């Protein structure tokens, strides 16, 4: 498994606008990558950049008091049970299928059977927090890294993908 670095840290929010204000205006971080899957409800995300890492700000919009909708939405359920805050840590990997195989071989419970679509055109897969000491971790393979993930070795020489 080749972990390239921390891709982002996920923050579950009940009010995305409030977290954008905190991370953008108050902390002075660059806000980018706003996505809204459905303007009438569903997941909204934005990213706040610090160095080479992002905070992924996530809000599930569900009708007030709709317990069924809350139970069916990961972020809404998390916020209802624990309140807003740290949700996950995402590790950038060179090859998500390899990372999933290696994690399973190491005895980690990979939730996803196959990679699923993530934000910014990425592929993602989650590891169950019960197998990681209570921390939700997910792998991220980004389309912009696929061509460059194996381009240079530690000595600067070209390295071919496996």
Placement of each model-derived feature along the sequence:
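Long, hydrophobic N-terminal alpha-helical segment
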Residues: 1-43, 48
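Intrinsic disorder/low-complexity detector
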Residues: 1-2, 18-21, 25-26, 30, ...
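Vicinal oxygen chelate
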Residues: 2, 13-20, 31, 46-49, 56, 69-162
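Residues embedded in well-ordered beta-strands within globular domains across many folds
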Residues: 7-10, 90, 140
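Short connector loops at helix/strand junctions that flank enzyme active sites
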Residues: 43, 50-52, 81-86
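A contiguous binding-surface segment within folded domains or other stable secondary-structure elements
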Residues: 52-54, 59-80
């Amino acid at each position: 498994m080749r972990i390239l670095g921390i891709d982002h840290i996920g923050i579950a929010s009940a009010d995305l606008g409030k977290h954008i204000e905190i991370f953008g205006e108050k902390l002075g971080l660059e806000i980018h990558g706003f996505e809204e899957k459905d303007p009438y409800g569903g997941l909204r995300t934005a990213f706040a950049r610090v160095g080479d890492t992002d905070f992924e700000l996530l809000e599930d919009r569900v009708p007030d008091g709709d317990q069924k909708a809350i139970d069916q939405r990961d972020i809404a359920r998390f916020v209802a049970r624990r309140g807003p805050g740290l949700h996950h840590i995402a590790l950038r990997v060179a090859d998500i299928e390899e990372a999933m195989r290696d994690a399973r071989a190491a005895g980690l419970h990979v939730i996803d059977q196959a990679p699923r679509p993530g934000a910014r055109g990425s592929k993602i897969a989650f590891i169950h927090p019960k197998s990681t000491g209570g921390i939700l971790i997910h792998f991220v393979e980004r389309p912009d890294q696929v061509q460059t993930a194996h381009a240079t070795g530690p000595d600067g020489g070209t390295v071919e993908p496996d």
